[in-house]
Amino acid sequence: MQDNILQAIFTPGTFLNMFNSATVVALAGLGCLLTDQAGMMNIGLDGIMLCGAFAGVIGSWLSGSWIVGVLCAICIGMLIGLFYGVMVIRWKSDEFIIGVALNLFAVALTTFLLRSIDGAQSAGTFHPTTGFIDTIPKIHFGVLGGTELNLYLMVPVTFVLVILCQFFIYRTPYGFWLHASGEHPDSLRSVGRSPEMMKYIGSIGCGFFCGLSGAYLSMGYSSTFSEGMTNSRGFIAVACVIFGRSNPLLVFLAALLFGFIDAAALRMQGFVDRTLTDTFPYLGTLLMMLVLALVQIRKRKRAA
């Protein structure tokens, strides 16, 4: 049985699913990274992603174009990011309370709108009736075991965005100003730059990436929208940012690790009860944080 499980896990399909799954978390992680650089930790990623997922699939369904859906998701995400920035930066609200509120409000709002559209009274799923899903660009790798092996174009696009974020943060003045707005706001003011403006840029940028992540989740990875479909991926993205030390490349690698665990869990459902395999991604995230904690404890002991 052990050999069968290993054969099921280490297949080309698993690794393609790894990239597809990691993309959702990596995009949200890039958004969280921007707010973290600005001295804020936005834990409302799940809510922004959920609103982006809903806006993306509904916008595409109404227009018949996946491009319109992506733009709708990005716009909604940026608006929510701006709202988060106003509440935290201007009104000095607690960032964690606002993040939790965003998550709760997004679940309630999208559930209400979904049930209003399809008339359901209980938990439901929205399946687009237009053919825009088939027009979303994919990279086709053939068929294996009767299953098509596809990699969505958003996967390589995400890698490009990771490289751009790496360059932006460590090689441009704006990246240094963004970091200074969180660590040394007074020093930033002394050179004539507004730390508040840089924080707003980080918050709106977070909304951009989370909206894009939500659009990919509902229009590409799942090709449908269901209530609470983010399944705490936003919190996993936060864990990836912490594990990756706010470095875009390391955050992407952490997301790939989550993606592999998620893809492997899907392959193991034929051998292990699904209720158990569903916990694997979260157990993997906890293990990542445990390893990081042990490494930090060891460094402190050496420093002492």
Over which residues does each language-model region extend?
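Single transmembrane alpha-helix segments in multi-pass membrane proteins
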Residues: 13-62, 70, 75, 79-96, ...
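Inter-helical junctions in multi-pass inner-membrane proteins, predominant
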Residues: 13-17, 169, 206-239, 271-279
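Hydrophobic alpha-helical transmembrane segments
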Residues: 15-18, 47, 51, 67-75, ...
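Short, non-helical or kinked segments that cap or interrupt transmembrane helices
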Residues: 34-52, 89-102, 177, 222-235, ...
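Pore- or pathway-lining transmembrane helices of multi-pass membrane proteins that form conduits
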Residues: 86, 90-115, 123-129, 158, ...
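Transmembrane helix-bundle core of multi-pass membrane transporters
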Residues: 106-171, 272-277, 304
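Helix-loop-helix "hairpin" substructures at the membrane interface of multi-pass membrane proteins
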Residues: 146-225, 248-249, 253
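Cytosolic-side transmembrane-helix boundaries in multi-pass membrane proteins
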Residues: 165, 173, 183-197, 266-304
